[in-house]
Amino acid sequence: MNRIVEKWMYRSRWLFAPVYIGLSLGLLALTIKFFQSMYEILPNIFALSEADLVLRLLSLIDLALVGGLLIMVIFSGYENFITNMEIEGAKDKLSWLGNMDAESLKNKVAASIVAISSIHLLGVFMDLKNIPDNKLLWYVVLHLTFVFSAFVMGYLEKISKRSKRANKANQG
């Protein structure tokens, strides 16, 4: 009975595969939104002020960072929790694929969130005259919370790796 339960539990990981397919559809939606924004920028390029252009470009950078985050989560999550990805033609394979464990993925996600938040905060500061002070304070507090969380996660991973190395040295 125990073996049947274990086999079922192990195979149940495939129930999560549609989530990664859904995230890849989210990547498609993000790509469409990116080109929609480009379509809105290009015809008006000469009418836009420098500040407006920079704000719109920051928005595109935001979309690109979110897209990169999605790709990381889709590939790493699929490979860590579902199955190894057998990509034919090693030239095409991403160098980090298969090398990122759940802990590293969490840290990369946290760093990406900080980068996205930084870009957004830069956009807020460029449009400062239209942002109420109390809202600005919350943007900064939220950003600092992301930065602090990413720092703590990185520090904890460093401690964890150091502890694992010490345990291996003591056993070997």
Swiss-Prot record:
What are the record keywords, sorted?
A: Cell membrane, Membrane, Transmembrane, Transmembrane helix
Q: Which Pfam families match?
A: UPF0114
Q: Does the keyword Glycoprotein apply?
A: no
- Gene Ontology CC, one term: plasma membrane
As for subcellular location, the record says: Cell membrane
Residue ranges of the TM segments: 15-35, 57-77, 108-128, 136-156
| Membrane topology label | Multi-pass membrane protein
Q: Which InterPro entries match?
A: UPF0114, UPF0114_bac
- UniProt keyword Transmembrane helix, yes or no: yes
- So what family is this one in? Belongs to the UPF0114 family.
Q: What is this protein called?
A: UPF0114 protein PMI3225
Instruction: Give the taxonomic lineage as stored in the record.
Output: Bacteria, Pseudomonadati, Pseudomonadota, Gammaproteobacteria, Enterobacterales
